[in-house]
Regions:
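Selected alpha-helical membrane-embedding segments in polytopic membrane proteins
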Residues: 3-113
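Hydrophobic alpha-helical transmembrane segments and adjacent short intramembrane/lumenal linkers
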Residues: 92-184
Length: 185
């Protein structure tokens, strides 16, 4: 999912290949390393469960900042859309060009969902199954990514509301969700 997201934004913004590689290596290596180290130490009983939460926290922080980079890219997309003069072309591009490409990272979420469902035998419990599907489903992720972008475009373009209000209004709930998930999870 992370690779798909980076690929999407690198294509969209024509990023240099060096930045593309560094971003992938940095994000993936730290997240994967924290997960592997935590799992190995717990399985070998070298650390207790509470200490392992430190590694989980590191992984969550890295994921949070990676999401922040993606949101920054989304803001640049929205800013570019707002600057377009032809509304028909603007929304045509948004639907026909960018939204289909956005499906690339959602494939990662779908595979992660299937992995968790079968690994944890979520079918044995409807509550567990609903929890897994709710946090990983393609619809939920598309809502988190696409709706705020559309909201900012609409508020800025049609209601002439400045970015100082439009951005917090549309992205604020998503940030709160991530913070809540980081603290509680």
């Amino acid at each position: 999912s992370l690779f798909g997201g980076v690929l999407f934004y690198s294509i969209l913004f024509d990023m240099r290949i060096i930045s593309f590689v560094v971003w992938i290596v940095y994000s993936f290596s730290i997240s994967f390393l924290s997960y592997v180290v935590s799992s190995e130490l717990i399985s070998n009983r070298l650390i207790d469960e509470p200490i392992s939460k430190v590694f989980s926290l590191i992984e969550s922080i890295v994921t949070f900042f990676a999401s922040g980079f993606m949101w920054l890219a989304y803001l640049l997309i929205v800013k570019r859309l707002v600057s377009m003069s032809n509304d028909e072309i603007k929304f045509k591009l948004l639907f026909e060009k960018w939204t289909p490409i956005l499906l690339i990272p959602t494939l990662g979420y779908l595979s992660a969902t299937a992995n968790v469902v079968f690994r944890e035998k979520a079918f044995d419990s409807i509550d567990t199954l609903m929890s897994v599907v709710f946090t990983n489903t393609i619809i939920f992720q598309m809502v988190l990514l696409v709706v705020p972008a559309y909201g900012i475009v609409i508020l800025k373009k049609y209601y002439e509301i400045g970015y100082n209000f439009a951005v917090p209004y549309c992205i604020g709930p998503v940030v709160v969700f991530y913070l809540f998930n980081l603290i509680v999870g």
